[in-house]
């Protein structure tokens, strides 16, 4: 089984802040599976660290208002072009690229709204089952993830 995973969840320091979101339970789930680590921001050539972005009115923007949409969508497109066939994607919740169910609202106030990040949306459109780390670990089956729990 091939699983595409947000690289920050694996402990790679690729977050906008320069840190990571290493998640031991995600790592345990991935044991025995082929892992395809991705960071769309890094794929797009953005530095680590980098200014934070949010999605405002469907566009990826920095706090200073600079539109970053094209570069973030380029990163998502590069992930799709190189990923090959994957059976499942586990992405970082809340991220403007990887958020599956919620994203920050574009005001940089910490408020979340329902929505998907640009990579999550592209994967869903490509027919890839997508979950975030919270959904994977909660036992909920909103995207049929339990069917993947025991697959090698």
Which residues fall in each region the model found?
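Short, active-site-adjacent cap segments at secondary-structure transitions
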Residues: 45-46, 96-99, 137-138
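Divalent-metal-activated hydrolytic enzyme cores
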Residues: 43, 52-81, 111-152
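Short N-terminal binding/cap micro-motifs at the start of the first secondary-structure element
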Residues: 11-18
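N-terminal glycine-rich phosphate/adenylate-binding segment common to multiple enzyme folds
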Residues: 78-107
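Short beta-strand segments
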Residues: 6-7, 39, 90-94
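Short, surface-exposed acidic-centric catalytic microdomains
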Residues: 21-62
